[in-house]
């Protein structure tokens, strides 16, 4: 309950859709709570601060998974002191200062790694409560913000990792990664598959091709999966890759056990109705799959957060890593021909998932808000030279 007017500023980023999805889940949850005294605003800090440079960086980021893996690996695994000397630490400083002094939020929620926040907390003594939502399953130094009052984490293991570098445990909350509440609702799998002209009695393999950013090789992969698992059916989600959808639709037009889709708003229904999923191990996608208890095969995860997520899920028994399409086909055949193994993996996921993670996170944020200082006590401390940043 918010008894006086309060404002939350969410800092997000559009490097991949996951951070935006987390932000939207939090915003929607607060709307459902119907809190008259709460204002929630969101800003893509880097895009707003440096639109052209950010656009270039985003293209590099996307292509790094395909062409510059070693470069991205070096950045991801670089030491904290190396990052501290990097310009990236100051990226967006002017825009952030403008936002804070104009909007005067009572709490800042980071859904994207924002190293520049440490510049404000360390140098400008702006005592605003800061909370961080980590959207992956292994610790990474970019998420560490000095003086952050709360870190919302996916697992107890991740909590132990944060505690091992000296972050007090009372600042660490295991809420799970925020996802839409629709992944908690019951789905009639038989009805869903039937209305999409698929057989409810066949094991359904869900492939999310849009996550890979490439168009080649999927036709052969689907054909080999069907050859090795003739009792199964395949649903291929092509995302916004229209060329891939057109090509695969033509190739499999006479197959009643293959469904080719483009962009869909029904990943929830497809996850709920499938027995196995081939995907990239993005933090949000695998959190949704964990909630839906659908085991996964991670095809060629890139070094960095993808690989770390995949290794964690494989260690827990929720999925398997396949570094090549051939290995993925072998894994699909092995699992679809061993339904008890698939069922065991699904049961492990059900026992480990954290339901209603977004609601739990938002309830804790409200608790932080109710104990935050009045904005005049916070922003009155800002030195004059800092206020000169404001335009």
Swiss-Prot record:
SUPFAM superfamilies: UDP-Glycosyltransferase/glycogen phosphorylase
Name of this chain's protein: Processive diacylglycerol beta-glucosyltransferase
EC nos: 2.4.1.315
Record's keyword annotation contains Lipid biosynthesis: yes
NCBIfam families per record: PRK13608.1
Source organism per UniProt: Staphylococcus saprophyticus subsp. saprophyticus (strain ATCC 15305 / DSM 20229 / NCIMB 8711 / NCTC 7292 / S-41)
Pathway: Glycolipid metabolism; diglucosyl-diacylglycerol biosynthesis
Catalytic activity of the protein: a 1,2-diacyl-3-O-(beta-D-glucopyranosyl)-sn-glycerol + UDP-alpha-D-glucose = a 1,2-diacyl-3-O-(beta-D-Glc-(1->6)-beta-D-Glc)-sn-glycerol + UDP + H(+); a 1,2-diacyl-sn-glycerol + UDP-alpha-D-glucose = a 1,2-diacyl-3-O-(beta-D-glucopyranosyl)-sn-glycerol + UDP + H(+)
Molecular function in Gene Ontology: 1,2-diacylglycerol 3-glucosyltransferase activity
Function description: Processive glucosyltransferase involved in the biosynthesis of both the bilayer- and non-bilayer-forming membrane glucolipids. Is able to successively transfer two glucosyl residues to diacylglycerol (DAG), thereby catalyzing the formation of beta-monoglucosyl-DAG (3-O-(beta-D-glucopyranosyl)-1,2-diacyl-sn-glycerol) and beta-diglucosyl-DAG (3-O-(beta-D-glucopyranosyl-beta-(1->6)-D-glucopyranosyl)-1,2-diacyl-sn-glycerol). Beta-diglucosyl-DAG is the predominant glycolipid found in Bacillales and is also used as a membrane anchor for lipoteichoic acid (LTA).
CDD domains per the UniProt record, alphabetical: GT28_Beta-DGS-like (cd17507)
HAMAP family in UniProt: Diacylglyc_glucosyltr
Homology family: Belongs to the glycosyltransferase 28 family. UgtP subfamily.
Protein's GO biological process: enterobacterial common antigen biosynthetic process; glycolipid biosynthetic process; lipoteichoic acid biosynthetic process
Keywords from the named record: Carbohydrate metabolism, Cell membrane, Glycosyltransferase, Lipid biosynthesis, Lipid metabolism, Membrane, Transferase
Xref: InterPro entries: Diacylglyc_glucosyltr_N, Glyco_trans_28_C, Glycosyltransf_28_UgtP, Pro_diacylglycrl_glcsylTrfase
Subcellular location: Cell membrane
GO cellular component: plasma membrane
Gene: ugtP
């Amino acid at each position: 309950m918010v008894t006086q007017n309060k404002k939350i500023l969410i800092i997000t980023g559009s490097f991949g859709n996951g951070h935006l999805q987390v932000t939207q889940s939090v915003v929607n949850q607060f709307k459902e709570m119907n809190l008259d005294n709460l204002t929630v605003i969101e800003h893509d800090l880097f895009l707003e601060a440096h639109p052209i440079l950010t656009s270039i960086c985003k293209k590099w980021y996307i292509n790094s998974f395909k062409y510059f893996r070693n470069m991205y690996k070096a950045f991801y695994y670089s030491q904290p002191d190396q990052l501290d000397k990097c310009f990236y630490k100051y990226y967006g400083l002017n825009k952030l200062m403008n936002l804070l002094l104009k909007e005067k939020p009572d709490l800042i929620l980071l859904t994207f790694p924002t190293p520049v926040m440490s510049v404000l907390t360390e140098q400008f003594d702006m005592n605003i409560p800061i909370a961080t939502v980590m959207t992956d399953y292994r610790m990474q130094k970019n998420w560490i913000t000095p003086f952050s009052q709360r870190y919302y984490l996916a697992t107890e293991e991740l909590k132990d990792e944060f505690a091992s570098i000296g972050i007090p445990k009372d600042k660490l909350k295991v809420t799970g990664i925020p996802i839409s509440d629709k992944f908690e609702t019951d789905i009639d799998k038989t009805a869903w598959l039937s209305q999409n002209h698929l057989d409810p009695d066949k094991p359904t393999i869900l492939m999310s091709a849009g996550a890979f950013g490439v168009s080649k090789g999927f036709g052969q992969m689907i054909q080999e999966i069907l050859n090795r698992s003739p009792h199964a059916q395949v649903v291929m989600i092509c995302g916004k890759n229209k060329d891939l959808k057109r090509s695969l639709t033509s190739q499999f037009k006479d197959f009643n056990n293959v469904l080719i889709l483009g962009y869909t708003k029904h990943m929830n229904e497809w996850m709920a109705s499938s027995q196995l999923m081939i995907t990239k191990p993005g933090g949000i996608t695998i959190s949704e799959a964990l909630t839906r208890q659908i085991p996964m095969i991670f095809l060629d995860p890139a070094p960095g957060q993808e690989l770390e997520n995949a290794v964690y899920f494989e260690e827990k028994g929720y999925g398997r890593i396949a570094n090549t399409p051939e290995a993925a086909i072998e894994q699909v055949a092995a699992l679809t021909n061993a339904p008890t193994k698939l069922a065991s993996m699904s049961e492990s996921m059900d026992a480990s998932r954290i339901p209603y993670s977004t609601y739990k996170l938002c309830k804790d944020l409200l608790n932080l808000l109710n104990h935050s200082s009045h904005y005049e006590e916070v922003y009155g401390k800002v030195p004059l030279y800092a206020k000169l940043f404001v335009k």
